[in-house]
Amino acid sequence: EILDLGTLDTKKGRPAQVLNACRILAEQGETVVLEVVGPITILNGLIDLRAVFKGMRKNPELMEKVFRKIEDDLSSYMQAAVAAGVKIISYGDAVATVPIMGPRVLKNYTEMNVLPFLRRMESELEHKALILLCPKTAYALEGTESASYKPLGMPQGTHPTYEDGWLFAIGKFGFMGQMCIKAGKRRVPEEKLYGIILKDEGDEDHEQ
């Protein structure tokens, strides 16, 4: 049924309303943050996750089509959000964790779905907005060696908050994600604020 759904139209319905609100706030000079969730979390709100995991094992080709459709819609939405003035996109697939998926399934999902999608978004958004990853997603990327942390390089003596780090990183990094977005007001030493660098596709080819 999911595959039978039409392509997301960002100019109609709730998506259009959200994007219009983002546009108004951006025009008023606000730094707009938009929350977006990943495929597993979206599917969790639609069907029993046991059916999803069974499909990933028994019918991976079908599930790949489902993931790709969701990712295509997410891509359209995120690009439209940036065009509307959004500067930070909070992105996470919080249901995609070891306790829920198990280490083997999570590793495969991270390497085969999460990493390629985030690479795609980094290319499409061209650092016009920062993607602030949920720490659970960031840890999964680091744990599978799909990404690494790099200091933002903030000036010493600024006593920044985590939120200050986001603003500094816009246009310089594609991703951050060392802490939850709720910790935005927490002060962090300059040298402890990190951007996230995705593993290059060329590194994978070399390993193979």
Regions found by a protein language model. Give the residues of each.
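A contiguous, low-structure linker/loop signature
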Residues: 1-7
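Active-site loop segments of alpha/beta catalytic cores
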Residues: 10-208
